[in-house]
A protein has these predicted regions:
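Alpha/beta-hydrolase-fold enzymes
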Residues: 121-204
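Catalytic active-site module of serine/aspartate enzymes centered on a nucleophile-bearing elbow/loop
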Residues: 268-303
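N-terminal cap/lid segment of alpha/beta-hydrolase-fold proteins
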Residues: 1-30, 83, 279-280
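The serine-hydrolase catalytic nucleophile loop
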Residues: 40-53, 67, 252
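Conserved alpha/beta-hydrolase
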Residues: 54-74
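Conserved alpha/beta-hydrolase "acid-adjacent" motif
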Residues: 247-253
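Catalytic nucleophile-loop/oxyanion-hole region of alpha/beta-hydrolase
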Residues: 43-47, 70-105, 109, 281, ...
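Short beta-strand/loop motif that positions the catalytic acidic residue
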Residues: 234, 240-242, 246
């Protein structure tokens, strides 16, 4: 595993590059590479190696990065989840990977989960050279997410989140320190994610650089983050993995996004909740499904 630095909008971002030791999918131009960013508030040391290392063993290079203001990357304010910035960071990571000497720049796949499961759809819609996309338990429609929050937490939950967001926005206007709220917490708390079981599920995979706090202003952005509106512009093969019991990322929105995509689409559904994707037998199952999809889409074409 190599430590890599790249820049996004002038800010230094940190990444891990894991070259495969296999020649299974190698072409004269190099190996295919999978670019991976984490979900809401996640860092590269939080659960991603459970996917990246099997990808590497299967024959794919992997590139895992921290978004600006998270983990080992630079950027201020710290812990600021901006879907626009994170999409830009994906684009910057793509350019960094395309410059790596042993990577086939024509066989790059994007992998995303939860919040980044939506990011990769948008980025692939914008960059037509992307070869494939894996979108796992994706958050594809912020409006649907707000509706779901009201369903499990009531209107009060949404009102509290907006109140914290406005407070943080006011702080930013007067150059005060950010107003932070938890990323994940128990039901009824002010955390951004507070569905039953979410706190235990998220914290079980937390890495050393992960912090359970986020700038509250992101609560004001959620409704505007709508990757579903880009879905019909996705031309490359797309794998969408949906949890039919997902309480965090609305499954109906993910299904609709898959239906709207213009290229080859595989929509796979599992009878699980959001954080069941990251461990246990279901993680093994859906990981195998991802590898099968990537084998089909990243195998070099015969001359």
């Amino acid at each position: 595993m190599e430590n890599i630095k790249f820049t996004s909008k002038g800010i230094t971002c940190s990444a891990w590059y894991i070259p495969t030791t296999s020649n299974k999918y190698k072409s004269s131009r190099g190996n295919p590479c999978i670019i991976m960013g984490n979900g809401f508030g996640g860092t590269k040391d939080t659960g991603l190696l459970h996917f990246a290392e099997p990808f590497s063993k299967a024959g794919f290079d992997t590139f895992i990065f921290d978004y600006r203001s998270f983990g080992d990357s630079g950027g201020f304010p710290r812990q600021n989840v901006s879907y626009k910035n994170q999409r830009e960071d994906y684009h910057a990571a793509i350019e960094a990977v395309r410059s790596l000497p042993n990577v086939d720049r024509n066989r790059i796949a994007l992998w995303g989960t939860s919040y980044s499961g939506g990011h990769v759809m948008v980025v692939a819609a914008q960059d037509k050279k992307i070869s494939a996309v894996v979108s796992m338990n994706p958050a594809t429609d912020g409006l649907a997410a707000l509706t779901q929050i009201c369903r499990y937490g009531g209107l009060k939950q949404l009102t509290v989140a907006v109140g914290h967001g406005l407070k943080d926005l006011a702080y930013s206007m007067f150059s005060k320190k950010p107003h932070l709220i938890p990323i994940v917490g128990q039901p009824g708390t002010a955390a951004m994610i507070s569905t039953p079981g979410a706190e235990a599920g998220y914290k079980s995979m937390a890495g050393p650089t992960w912090r359970n706090e986020v700038c509250a202003r992101t609560a004001l952005e959620v409704a505007r983050n709508r990757p579903i509106t880009f879905a019909n512009q996705i031309l490359c093969p797309l794998l969408v993995q949906v949890g039919s019991n997902d309480q965090v990322a609305p499954p109906d929105a993910a299904r609709k996004s898959a239906d709207l995509a213009s290229g080859q689409v595989e929509l796979l559904e599992y009878p699980i909740d959001h954080f069941d994707f990251y461990s246990g037998s279901w993680q093994e199952k859906l990981l195998n499904d991802q590898i099968n999809f990537l084998e089909k889409t990243l195998t070099p074409k015969q001359a």
